[in-house]
């Protein structure tokens, strides 16, 4: 039996896919990267916003074609979309043989057995019975990097977000379990450890009543073999002085702050059920830049949130222009059923959202280009991720300033002798909006 896996959505979902692949491997089943060759296909879906739902449905229908044209006999849906719409999808998509919820994916071995026995399965567990899974994992990332998921669920309850309903309340993984997995990843040659959760700053609060991320970073910093520790999804309301100190003092912790801010208008922040005002965020950002030399700050913003006026948007533009973030992602608000914001009456017209999106993106593009040009002649350590298809002597890599998949790349000239996963010292020659060009030092 050959099994194929298609993983959609965020890195946290990818970790779930890797856990499922590890379970499948333990069952002595073959795993293939080619869906056309698979007899059973698992699609780990995303259901966060409308575009993600559309991609998930499209992928499932595409995989279902292999039942007619390929080797596929069975199709299993896992992840957030299945959790959110299990009843409707089970009825409307007969080509799907099983739907598995976000809290029951570790039962994938049992689900496969049921499907192979000819049963059609809808397997959902109550989210309160959280199963925050330890290894085994079968890594699908390059050998030199891996994600380390430290918690599941979310307690922030932002008014636009469906995640707490899909993933349940915030549940930290046991500290010793997280460290054991990190040591295992280091022993397998991982150089870049990327710490993820829906909210990494809240880690440990439900275990001990204390925020444990600062101590976790200090302990991870002692692991042999690990070169970079990158932390994603840091929320501003739990960014303590101790956490700032951990970033500043731990040499392996990347001076890279991924902190979703979403807006700068106090009125909209309150409507979003965010915990901070613009003034509080500005105070935190000033403290971060003062105490962490060489810091890069990445953030995300939502435009077109219900009730966003021209004045609100102008305030956001002013905030971004003054803060000069190194990297920022911009999203058009997606009206999601089941959320507080989705039921608000003052929804923004799509054309207005689109215009504001392009205006903010253009502003940020100019800022990013200026920052990249300011880095010309600077020396950086870069991890090699591959080579340009048209010019094999041009290596492609990242420094601590860039997270995989979401930030830009650094192109290294005359680098044909380098190897993927190698860390090298480079000098920046030219900076552009999303990329930089460098030479070996």
Identify the role of each PLM range.
Residues 178, 195, 231, 259, ...:
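Conserved, mostly hydrophobic/aromatic
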Residues 75-79, 84, 89, 187-311, ...:
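Conserved SAM/AdoMet-binding glycine-rich loop
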Residues 343-441:
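Terminal RNA-binding accessory module
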Residues 93-94, 115-118, 211-213, 247-248, ...:
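Short, hinge-like loop/turn segments at secondary-structure boundaries
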Residues 10, 204-225, 271-272, 335-366:
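Radical SAM enzyme [4Fe-4S]-AdoMet core and its adjacent flexible, acidic
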Residues 197, 233, 261-263, 299-303, ...:
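Active-site proximal loops enriched in glycine and acidic residues that flank catalytic Cys/His/Asp
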Residues 1-203, 242, 257, 279-290, ...:
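Proteins enriched for Cys/Gly/acidic motifs involved in redox and nucleic-acid/cofactor modification
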